[in-house]
From Swiss-Prot:
It comes from Arachis hypogaea (Peanut). Probably has antifungal activity. Residues 1-32 form the signal peptide. Not glycosylated. This is Defensin 2.
Amino acid sequence: VQKRTIIMEKKMAGFCIFFLILFLAQEYGVEGKECLNLSDKFKGPCLGSKNCDHHCRDIEHLLSGVCRDDFRCWCNRKC
């Protein structure tokens, strides 16, 4: 009975390690890396992320935009 328990514990440990590796591999999947850059053309203080996002997408043709604590518009682009 003790041998059977040890074998089952080893199988369970291997099973857990396999799924841990599988989970971590998903986290580092094949996605394009994104970089956050200060907008070149946004004028004035950035008070609403909706305006910044619209500007980055439609005017600078980038992925998205967000206002940060420095009241400037930052755009996301692929690196």
